Amino acid sequence: MEVTEANLQLLAGYLQQTLSADPNVRRPAEKLLESTELQQNYPILLLNLIDKAQMDMTTRVAGAIAFKNYIKRNWAAHLDSDGPDRIHESDRNTIKTLIVTLMLHSPVALQKQLSDAVSIIGKYDFPKKWPQLIDEMVERFASGDFNVINGVLQTAHSLFKRYRYEFKSQALWEEIKFVLDRMAKPLTDLLQAKMQLTKVHENNAGALKVIYGSLVLVNKVFFSLNSQDLPEFFEDNINTWMGAFIQQLAADVPSLRTADDEDAGVLEHLRAQVCENICLYAKKYDEEFKPFMEQFVTAVWELLVKTSLHTKYDSLVSHALQFLSVVADRQHYQSIFENPEILAQICDKVVIPNLDIRPSDEEIFEDSPEEYIRRDIEGSDIDTRRRAACDLVKTLSINFEQKIFGIFGQYLERLLTKYKENPATNWRSKDTAIYLVTSWASRGGTQKHGITQTSELVPLPEFCAQQIIPELERPNINEFPVLKAAAIKYVMVFRSILGPQVLASCLPQLIRHLPAESSVVHSYAACSVEKILSMRDASNAIVFGPQILAPYTTELISGLFATLSLPGSGENEYVMKAIMRSFSVLQSAAMPFMGVALPRLTEILTQVAKNPSRPQFNHYLFETLALCIKIVCHADSSAVSSFEEALFPVFQGILQQDIVEFMPYVFQMLSVLLEMREGTGTIPEPYWALFPCLLSPALWDRTGNVTPLIRLISAFIKQGSAQIQALGKLSGILGIFQKMIASKANDHEGFYLLQNLLSYYPPAEIQTNLRQIFGLLFQRLSLSKTPKYLSGIIIFFSFYVIKFSGSQMAQLIDEIQPNLFGMLLDRVFITEMGKIPKEQDRKMVAVGVTKLLTETPEILQQQYATFWPRLLHSLIDLFERPPEKLMGLEIGETAGVAEDPDAGYQVAFAQLTHAQPNQQDHLAEIKDARQFLATSLSKFAQARAGEFSTLLSPLEPEYKQVLQKYCDQAGVRIA
């Protein structure tokens, strides 16, 4: 693809089409760009378009976003597999040559996207493959151009912010040191220069805005560079930085004050970041920070007292309160808070004002209920005043429990008295009281169980009976909706503390609130019902089973479905999750409702498929459908055809229209339906019409499709291998196997597919391909020997030995390369088999290795005989030692990195709990692998009496003792 004017115009046209609201215009353009992005010069063409000043800015921004997403998808894709690099080497070098300069002279809208692209490239290439990046950036500090400097700082922030969350490692330390050696001093010099410039330009509002914007970014970079450990340079220059932070907290620049009450200005952002920085130091480096502590506590306190309740200050106040919480939690700073007068002032001037619901919060409650819910019960309120005030209350009540009890008790009484005087006017006082009690009493808990540890001084069940239940019993469910929501949340949060009796009395009231007009109220009602129904007792039995639910079942199910018809709740995830949970608890007792529920669920699926926009709702919708299939088909297995009749048209529409968000779910649902048919005869024709499409390479390029597709293909193999053979599709399946085995992320799926082929496909045809299959396994072993792959290949070969024979395996392997079987034993089985983590896999390996030892003559041949005692030694280790924990060994486990917020977007695979595949134990007849070893060795010893003692002689005495123990337990002899 040449960089020509004609190609630039063509690319611009397609980018404009990707912005269309019409999917018939947008999707073809997206697909075309996706199909051309692997051509050489494609990214260079994009960069040229972004740099073209004459081009429409909307198109340039679309190009910048497309470039960033291209980098996300492709820059590191080859690291996952042994496939070719998707980006030509010359393009990589050109990108790294052009991008920094292009970013720095681009408008802000483009700069942000390009900066993100730099940080993604830097994550993989910096510093080893891109060492000049830092020097190139630091050089620009001397340019004197504020916008260029801010561009560099934005890039540094994007590049280094992963230091905040990555796990510690030697490689990470080395990278941070590389950065500090080049960046720490220039950053400190820049801080001092910018602080000086605030005085030089004190009468130039435009310049001050850019200068203070620079300081915000300087502080963000400082935070990232200090997140892992305290660098020596910053410790040596702590006075410079802390002095600047004090000045920044005190800075009051009239020209930078904003008239807007909602959006924070640059000063608010600056102070919030300062509070975040000093919070980090107070938490992690309190010894070095100690000399500055009182000065900062005073500065933050003064800032809090004079800061108004406007929304624009929320992040600042939140971080300031977090700082006070950290200080109050440190024993050697607690003297600051021990004075009862100071505690009373904190409660009066800081805690209560920030616990109160504000007009802006009420506005969000009414107009943006989803945002309110996210903040209030989903934990996205990390930067809200209420959350920070609650955390401060919790910290103070833990560390100064007796002193704070009296102070908070007085406030609580005052708030409740005020409410009683005039509920219609003073309902906000009770809302504050509920929040105060919640944060005051809470000591610890989990998302799954709610609050599980509380203060003994706060009588929660009594407060619930006197203050919460009366609110829920009010006849008008639409009265005081904010207060209703707070009361429902109280029940939900303290469900593990209140006990089954109290909850049983609350349950009908919660169900009664499902039709409430307020989205927040009926969402909270659904959410609390779901969480209460999820509760289990000490024996893991459901606390509220079908018998307890029986009086309310009709009202519950009809109420939940009716809620989905309320304005704004057509795709309410809490309601759909509650429907799922209700059916899960009811099981067969849900059958009377299926006649109404199933058509409604199918109708909802048809509607949401047109525009999938609520991932959580969609997930629980599919969960509910999968659960319904299991409940109904458990009662009547022939009902599967009714489900197929209802759902196939919808599924076919989803697949034909390439609705990528739903495909992983559709493949799981098809697997469930097909597995339900096992043993009932041939696979119906509609499945076979779909089968060739399942082998399409494009489907397998989407990571979210891989696991459910492997399961679906395996179901076809299990029930229809003869038909697959007749269709001549084995080569297509083997192509998928080859793709899976080449991938570090998906090699386990390749092994799973291969096991199914060997188990259910006609042996004669699969045997002709075995040499090629084994060759691919050894090729991957030599190219990329990851711990997960080693585990997979050991399990697979053990399975092969059990299914066929060790002799057949040894002969086939040695045909590929002489003595390769011995290398497999020596370098893979003997050294690695003890590291396999899962019990069922360890059993498979134990039985397979036992058969190698006792039923495989090849291992007794001269060139392999020395491996026999070593293999037995490793097998005993497998039995006697716990599995070693290995990075990235478990499927889905991430090796050594925290979740990466910059990872490229792809529809992920989300396993449906109610569509889990049945676990198959290939060795159900073998109850104890140790006894199987003992019995097998006993037979082997009898058959080869003279040979056996020679083979066993190199084994250490303690291992022989363990072996004797196995024999005693099995009641057999080996000597």
Curated annotation (Swiss-Prot):
Keywords: Cytoplasm, Nucleus, Protein transport, Transport
Domain Importin N-terminal positions: 29-105
Cell compartment(s), UniProt: Cytoplasm; Nucleus
Biological function: Export receptor for importin alpha. Mediates importin-alpha re-export from the nucleus to the cytoplasm after import substrates have been released into the nucleoplasm.
Subunit composition and interactions: Binds with high affinity to importin-alpha only in the presence of RanGTP.
Family to which the UniProt record says this protein belongs: Belongs to the XPO2/CSE1 family.
Name assigned to this protein: Exportin-2
Species name: Drosophila melanogaster
